């Protein structure tokens, strides 16, 4: 839990430096993927989401502003970008990953349930 608080503090500091990184005209992951994403915290600086993807689960297309992923429970994921690009990643429990704004959908192609904390940066 201490790691999460440190991560949130660092992200708040990044928000001060980098300002607004919101994706305009984007599909909100909390709305389009409400069955797999839950809101944990929202304020003027960040929005923290928890995403859970069971094996074989697929999200709908959505967008994120700049954000950080903290991997609670790892697994293998395939990301499909709005531009048609397809990438695969093997998330390991405890990984912390920074991502620039993007529009994508993801699917769990592994055999374990993936759990992620997503910290989206606001202005």
Task: Map each language-model feature to its residues.
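Ligand-binding loop in jelly-roll beta-barrel domains
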Residues: 101-122
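Histidine-centered metal-chelating micro-motifs
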Residues: 56-59, 97-107
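Glycine- and acidic-residue-biased ligand/ion/polar-headgroup-sensing regions
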Residues: 64-83
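Conserved short histidine dyad/triad with adjacent acidic residue
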Residues: 47-63
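Short N-terminal segments immediately surrounding and downstream of signal-peptide cleavage
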Residues: 21-44
